[in-house]
């Protein structure tokens, strides 16, 4: 049974989060009564308010008002006053993934999972389905530039969603098609062990119904191992691996564009198909890999090669995925969400491939627990940056862990062999270093899932101020 419209007012706690805001927006657009709260104002909050949704800043019991259902983001703890009030009122309390699952019951659904690349891959699948005139509903973990939002209604039969594995609730999503881009050591604070992470992704794939299929990246050893354990579902593999069903090859970089070919071999029919001279307006092999996952689905759903080619060429990207925020004296400045060592390594490799000069990475480590679990991996992921600037850790509500701070990370990266790693404290430090050290052709790349994005947005202006010999300041 689909969710009835007479369930009453739905209250979203933590509605400003990227996943929650998209779900709230879609429920509002479907005609449900929606309100919410968040601990801080944000662009997502303002976007929802612009649609007429009432949102309170700060978490207080009275925010619930006449709510009949309460939806919690994964970040909300049981000590939250709105959670406590909902329990006292005996209201239904629903996790974010459960509400997303309710939306998925309305459509045929594609769920994109993996420890990295989910947001970009989700956006690319949406772009190719758009190009094929499928007009999908989309709920993503990032702002899709073509839409200006992370949620889109769509009037077609298909829905594309990002499947967040961080708390295990992605196993509740009823997907007809499941994508797994990669499986790395992540969210160990929730799962407890990497074996539990592996098992969760196996279950994610096996949850696909017999009439659906999974799309798995054969370039990743853990995903290839997963593919070998799936014997009762239809699996399509992709990557550079010669054994993959859908291979991408002949890559060449041209600034912020990548040219490549795709070769498709159907295990069912034996038919072979070539898509040559594809152009993706993004740099990096990791982005071509994500695009190939999208191509696999589009091809299987019968979208023409011409539409696939057009959809890729016109792909507008995702906010905070190697997004250029400005330039100064020939120095290009970028903002990226990458915060796991695998993501950081991929972004810096792409920057190295396309930059004419040096690569300067400004990194804000995200969560003490992640740094603790992946300390050695962080030491080895910056090799493609000529200079690494480590900012204070963005704790995201976590308490510091002794011996695993920004200063210790700087020393650990140096011990691993990097020649130029520096500790910084504020944006003024970045302005000073870039203005005196960087040269035309260099890339300055901000990396992190926290508020370092504000630095990336502010840096071009702060550098421009120097040209006028004025003092600069940062709020």
Swiss-Prot record:
Domain of life the protein comes from: Bacteria
One GO BP annotation of this record: regulation of cell shape
Keywords: ATP-binding, Cell cycle, Cell division, Cell shape, Cell wall biogenesis/degradation, Cytoplasm, Ligase, Nucleotide-binding, Peptidoglycan synthesis
Top-level enzyme category: ligase
EC number: 6.3.2.8
Residues annotated as transmembrane: none
Biological or metabolic pathway of the protein: Cell wall biogenesis; peptidoglycan biosynthesis
Subcellular location: Cytoplasm
Similarity section: Belongs to the MurCDEF family.
Job description of the protein: Cell wall formation.
NCBIfam families: murC
Protein name per its UniProtKB record: UDP-N-acetylmuramate--L-alanine ligase
